[in-house]
């Protein structure tokens, strides 16, 4: 998915609803065993960093999940990516443990979406 303003791309992200095999090896505990969406990658254009685009992206992800009847979102990020870990925690994601993916340790996060949340009402 792309988030843009006019002809400018502000952000790019990949959302997958098929699960992630490496999440089965979590060293820790997921918040739920419900079907979930995975945000595989998110990149914000340098011109748009610090403008809340990541938070807008997560709101849109939650709205898409609600439309699909999915109430769990999982994300992993490199252990050294303090900025993304901050963005995840700021947007209500809880740290669940670590996984081994792509030859490195990743920090894994999950957020539960309220079932009665509507558009712009997800938590």
Task: Describe each model-derived feature in a short phrase.
Residues 1, 35-37, 105-109:
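Short beta-strand micro-motifs in enzyme catalytic cores
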Residues 44, 50-63, 86-90:
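Conserved acetyl-CoA-binding loop-helix of GNAT-fold acetyltransferases
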Residues 49, 75-85:
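Conserved beta-strand-loop-alpha-helix junction that forms the acyl-donor binding cleft
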Residues 76-77, 89-108:
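Conserved catalytic-core motifs of GNAT/GCN5-like acyltransferases
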